[in-house]
Design a protein with these regions (language model features):
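Conserved pre-motif I regulatory segment
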Residues: 1-40, 144
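Conserved interdomain hinge at the start of the Helicase C-terminal
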Residues: 205-208
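P-loop (Walker A) phosphate-binding loop of NTP-binding proteins
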Residues: 40-43, 73
């Protein structure tokens, strides 16, 4: 808890915010629970910081290897998340991978055993196929803007990445739309749904 408090203080200070909002606090409260998370929220709600704080709270300096993977639908979002991480996660090795970026440069960065990887589905899948990303130590998987990933046609790449991951301890799926069903390959474990869509001031917390 002491480490989490320090993480929150550092994030607020470096991002020039006074305190966490309700969504961010609720996300952190789920960090040690065994349930996976479905976070439904609109753009500009503080979603990125909400899941990044949870991810960072679970990273251990004692483990060598990739502990967290954040999959996003676009280069722009990958760079945005990478920028936030650079401000709040000093000392943690982070690699950002996306189409249009130098594969050679990414490969060199991946060779130094990052703890956290952010990237787009196609580029992440390609690095995995070539053995540049190994996910045997993966603890936390984030599928950010999952609805957009599907809308952009990344279902096959995402299934290729996610289906083999049998030992991931926590999955976080974010979306701006609510759906009654999810592709089977997500394989969420007793997910808790945090719903911040619409005009609600507080979330609905629904174990499903």
């Amino acid at each position: 808890m002491k480490e989490t408090s320090a993480l929150i203080d550092k994030a607020c200070r470096n991002l020039n915010i006074d305190s966490l909002n309700g969504m961010q606090k609720q996300m952190l409260e789920t960090a040690t629970r065994p349930n996976d998370i479905i976070l439904l929220s609109p753009t500009g709600s503080g979603k990125t910081l909400a899941f990044l704080l949870l991810v960072l709270s679970r990273i251990s300096p004692k483990i060598a290897g990739v502990q967290a993977l954040v999959i996003v639908p676009s280069r722009e979002l990958a760079l945005q998340i990478d920028n936030v991480l650079r401000k709040i996660a000093a000392g943690i090795k982070i690699v950002c991978c996306y189409g249009g970026h130098s594969v050679r440069e990414e490969s060199k960065s991946l060779a130094v055993a990052p703890a956290l990887i952010v990237g787009t589905p196609g580029r992440i899948a390609d690095h995995i196929r070539r053995g540049r990303i190994v996910l045997e130590t993966l603890d936390t998987l984030v599928l950010d803007e999952f609805d957009k990933c599907l809308a952009l046609g990344f279902q096959d790449e995402m299934q290729e990445i996610i289906a083999p991951l049998k030992n991931v301890k926590k999955k976080i799926l974010t979306s701006a739309t609510d759906s009654e069903s999810l592709p089977a390959f997500t394989a969420l474990k007793k997910p808790i749904k945090l719903n911040f869509l619409g005009s609600r001031k507080d979330s609905e917390t629904t174990p499903t």
